[in-house]
Amino acid sequence: MVYVEAVPVRCDPLGYVTEVGLLLQATPEGRMVRSFVSGRVMYRETIRGALLRHLEKDLGALALPQLPPTLVPFTVAEFFPSPSQSGLTDERQHAVALAYLIPVTGECNPRQDALELSWLTPDEALSPEIYAEFSGGRGDLLRQALASAGWGR
């Protein structure tokens, strides 16, 4: 199964990441976890179409995501049902996700199963407190996303 993961960001006029948008969601067990925009690519759907659909579904129609002309992911994430060398888990399935850093310029209002969208600085988003709120290894995906944008050099 192929998925897309999108880390929404706000950038300054030079293109540097100033804020990261993290969704807060409740698990079926009642735990609160941080997450990104994510979802599967439907049959006969393009990657670009899947990204736009999930960004609108999770952030609202006025988020105004800025997809790059070339959709090269910052990583290809492989999720396994049990712990593995990838560090990423999804107890439901073995899945592959193309992960993107996507600038958004509009008004974001979380929809679907998200309780809130928090805009944090990269330092805040990488703090141990926030990192602990991710499940399935997604905190490591955030580190990779920000590293791909030159953060932490």
Label each PLM-derived region with a short phrase.
Residues S35-E45:
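Short histidine-centered catalytic/ligand-binding loop motif
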Residues L22, T75, W119-T121:
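Structural signal for conserved beta-strand scaffold positions within catalytic alpha/beta enzyme cores
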Residues M1-F36:
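N-terminal strand-loop-strand
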Residues G60-C108:
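Active-site segment of metal-dependent pyrophosphate-handling enzymes
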Residues V7, C11-D12, V17, E56, ...:
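A structural signal for the main folded, soluble domain(s) of proteins
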Residues P28-R34, Q93, A97-R153:
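Nudix hydrolase/Nudix homology domain
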